[in-house]
């Protein structure tokens, strides 16, 4: 199975048991599994990475202001990477749970 196929299968498995209100597996995020060689600065390692598309958040603010104001926050893309340095490369189920926990901090 290719890394892309393994990542999709892991995402679906995580989705089946995750009970979080927000879950990376339900959202439209790019989810990949990777392996890094010993020559890589973070290697040898393996892990998962998600990329969350940015967006604009707008809200009307009336409290503590003489006039109603519109507050707009424009956020770019966010990338979350989890690196595992164990001796058994593979897409561990715990990596999906960790990336979901980090996703919920965003």
Swiss-Prot record:
This is Probable early E3 12.1 kDa glycoprotein. The keyword Glycoprotein applies. Keywords: Early protein, Glycoprotein. It comes from Human adenovirus B serotype 3. Glycans are attached at residue 77. Belongs to the adenoviridae E3A-2 family. Disulfide bonds: none annotated. Not yet known. Pfam families: Adeno_E3A.
């Amino acid at each position: 199975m290719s890394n892309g196929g393994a990542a999709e299968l892991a995402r679906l498995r995580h989705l089946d048991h995750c009970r979080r209100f927000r879950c990376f597996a339900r959202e439209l995020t790019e989810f990949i599994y990777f392996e890094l060689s010993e020559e890589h600065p973070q290697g040898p390692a393996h892990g998962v990475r998600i990329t969350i598309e940015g967006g604009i958040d707008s809200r009307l603010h009336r409290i503590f202001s003489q006039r109603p104001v519109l507050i707009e926050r424009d956020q770019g893309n966010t990338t979350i990477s989890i690196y595992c340095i164990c001796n058994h490369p593979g897409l561990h189920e715990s990596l999906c749970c960790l990336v979901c926990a980090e996703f919920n901090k965003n």
